[in-house]
Amino acid sequence: LPQQPVLPILFERLMMKNVTGYLHSVETAGALDGPGIRRVLFLNGCPLNCVYCHNPDTRKYKGGTKTDAFTELRAIARQKEMLLSMKGGVTLSGGEPLWQPAFVKAIFEGSKMMGLHTALDTSGFLGKKADDELLSFTDLVLLDIKHFDPDAYKRVTGVDLQPTLDFAERLSALKKPVWMRFVLVPGYTDDMDSISRMAAYAKDLGNVERVEVLPFHKMGEYKWEAMEMDYALFDIQEPEPDLVTMAKSRFEDEGMVVF
């Protein structure tokens, strides 16, 4: 463990509290989920049923490996110097990490005590589970908004859009930095009117530092087949570059920084 006296005290407290969680996998040097090089923990459990989900194996809450915050913080501590030197930190993703809010809070609290940047990758649907203390340990929220039309959102995800918007507005009120993410799926999320309204909404929030337009890909298709699940997007191809450019331009028209 690192030598700072506060860390063993924190870890001992976590051991006593026995904060457990279910983990799907860990990426030790991620470069896509927040600034710098990051340790990314993918948590199990998700209430959404996104038709284009590339990690359907994370949906089941207890489908992953049971772990505890003490164990995971020890692993983070071993990477601390590298993460700091690469201007990175720790990202919790999923699945939907807010299905395990106590675990998220413990990991982020420990990470902040090590001086590490923290990022939460979430759909926002369970935003009410993120209390103010959890958000105080969160430096950045990667907010995935799947669609801006409520009916289309429900068709794509199986759940309502409003909880995500409520969470977005709460983050705005807190002035919590947000990177908004939007997956562009031909025939499902490519309605330019809806994208324009999403772009205007992102601008009005005032705390969205950047927007990432992520082209749909088929890399998770084999997981659906392996799990014998019906994959609705089997015949859907990845979006053409012109479509991606058009979607990005709607955000750029609102003055947003777009990737």
What are these regions (language model features)?
Residues Q4-P5:
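Cationic, low-complexity basic patches in intrinsically disordered or flexible, solvent-exposed regions
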Residues L10-G30, P186-F259:
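Auxiliary Fe-S-binding modules of radical SAM enzymes
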Residues N18-V19, S25-E27, A31-T67:
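Canonical Radical SAM [4Fe-4S] cluster-binding loop centered on the CxxxCxxC motif
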Residues D57-Y61, K154-D160, E228-I236:
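Short glycine-enriched, charge-decorated loop/helix-capping segments at active-site entrances
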Residues K66, G158-L161, E238-P241:
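Short, conserved loop/turn and helix-capping segments at secondary-structure boundaries
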Residues L73, A77-G89, S93-M219, K223-E225:
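Conserved AdoMet/S-adenosylmethionine-binding subsite of the radical SAM
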